[in-house]
A protein has these predicted regions:
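Adenine nucleotide-associated cytosolic modules
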Residues: 1-253
Length: 253
């Protein structure tokens, strides 16, 4: 770190639990963020401002006027533009010293597998179960830590799945791919704007702790937030030994 960086990140360096070594690890790290919507907006901006050295943002959508209520990484003049490019422009303005790659695509399973391989931490900020499960499978295969978030109406959740740790669960252990989950979308059910900011910020927090090597992460815990009542709930997670993605069923296959 040079003197200018020490000044930029000085409030991190003042933290005994963080300090220069952790900041150096953060500056050397690569985060893959899938989704530049409500969750991704908050996560991306805090990753950039905190000094995540390299950020790859993947999103195949374009900015719509209805997005601006909660997707704060985009601006009014971004309407109609690719979300990945719009987000990258904002991040570059926040922190020009980091490397930002914008991928304007809907990454399928094979593409996600390749992208995950090159990352140190993966943030799932997507809005559908098919993508979430594809990201999870890639993270399990590559043994990369996954920070998963979701938010709809007034309810949000965040969890960390880190199979580098013995006994850790994966996303499929919690939400089986064939469990007939309903696809709940903001377009039909609505979403409270600050909710996705809260969850996305927590995703950034967990990702930073993972790559910087500080504190205890949410691995093994699911945090649920009820924004209407401002209540938090914690659910303990355990690996499903018969999980088709990370358990015995996968090994048998």
């Amino acid at each position: 770190m040079d003197d200018r960086q020490r000044l930029r990140y000085s409030r991190h360096l003042l933290l005994n639990e963080f300090g220069e070594d952790a900041q150096e690890r953060l500056l050397a790290a690569h985060a893959l963020v899938v989704g530049a919507g409500g969750l991704g907006s908050a996560a991306l901006m805090y990753l950039a401002s905190s000094g995540m050295g390299r950020i790859t943002v993947v999103d195949g959508d374009r900015v719509d006027l209805t997005n601006l209520q909660r997707q704060v990484v985009h601006r009014s003049d971004s309407v109609g533009k690719p979300k990945a490019a719009s987000a990258a422009a904002t991040l570059a303005a926040i922190n020009p010293d980091i490397r930002i790659e914008a991928l304007e695509e809907r990454a399928g399973p094979e593409r996600l597998m390749a992208l995950v391989q090159g990352a140190d931490v993966v943030l799932d900020c997507s809005d559908n179960f098919a993508t979430r499960h594809a990201i999870n499978r890639a993270c399990v295969a590559a043994r990369k830590p996954l920070v998963s978030g979701a938010g709809i109406r007034f309810d949000g959740q965040v969890a960390v799945f880190d199979l580098r740790r013995e006994g850790s669960a994966c996303y499929h252990c919690l939400f089986a791919e064939d469990s007939r989950e309903s696809e709940e979308r903001c377009a039909t059910l609505g979403v409270f704007a600050p909710l996705v900011g809260v969850i996305g910020t927590l995703q950034a927090l967990e990702a930073i702790k993972l790559v910087a090597g500080v504190g205890e992460t949410l691995d093994g815990r699911l945090m649920l937030f009820e924004a209407l009542d401002s209540r938090w709930h914690e659910v303990r997670l355990a690996r499903d030994p018969e999980c088709r993605v990370c358990g015995a069923a996968r090994r048998a296959a």
